[in-house]
Amino acid sequence: MPFVRPLVTVVRAGRHSYSAGLQLQQRLARSNQILNPPAEFRNYLVLQEHDPVYTVGLRTKDYTAQDEDRLRRLGADFHRTDRGGLITFHGPGQLVAYPILHLGQFVPSIRWYVATLERMVVEACHQMGISSAKATKDTGIWVGDNKICAIGIHGSRYVTTHGIGLNCCTDLQWFEHIVPCGIEGKGVTSLSKELDRHFPVEEASGALLNSFAKVFECRLQEHAKKPASSAEIG
């Protein structure tokens, strides 16, 4: 029987609050999780930008109410999430991609998924002219000692949520108020900084989609329209 590449629907969600993006991905994951067999699952790749927000993952216990208040006073929101990883920033100029996949259609392994996600981002960076981008023992994708892409995922019953935040033309000053992903002595960078030109999210999206289809060996289809809310998808 010939191999049929899994189908993934691309949802271009635009810019909105972190809460709205979280509700969208949770709804998509919940609506499909009950399906059996996994072949019936509808896979999604949600592309978006967030309003300024600091998020902390499952392992973060260090950020107190005072820390949260300090960060909110900068003009950003603050959320505790169910993803892996420590604190990071999302905001305008950053391409956030949330793959909502049933790994039963790919490889049923969270370890494989994280490694493939890393490979996908590295491939996309190479396509955009950053040949030195690579994965290391530290989470995320790096250019030298500077992180260009954060990775934090959640998996339940082989259904993935959360994903990546690729700095395109992000204002990197937001990162100066935290220790990104809890890694001391390292910095952050962006496509714009590395390539010495303005690199918008829309331009990066094309390379990311090309890389995603190639590395995950899947077919991509565009969702019919940009959703105004999670209720418009299903």
Curated annotation (Swiss-Prot):
Substrate binds at R83, G84, G85, L86, I87, T88, F89, H90, A150, I151, G152, G163, I164, G165. The active site is at C181. It comes from the Eukaryota. Residues 39-220 form the BPL/LPL catalytic domain. One of its GO terms (cellular component) is mitochondrion. PROSITE patterns: BPL_LPL_CATALYTIC (PS51733), LIPB (PS01313). Keywords: Acyltransferase, Mitochondrion, Transferase, Transit peptide. GO terms for biological process: protein lipoylation. Residues 1-28 form a transit peptide. The record marks K147 as: Lowers pKa of active site Cys. One of its GO terms (molecular function) is lipoyl(octanoyl) transferase activity. Its EC number is 2.3.1.181. Catalyzes the transfer of endogenously produced octanoic acid from octanoyl-acyl-carrier-protein onto the lipoyl domains of lipoate-dependent enzymes. Lipoyl-ACP can also act as a substrate although octanoyl-ACP is likely to be the physiological substrate. This is Putative lipoyltransferase 2, mitochondrial. It comes from Drosophila melanogaster (Fruit fly).
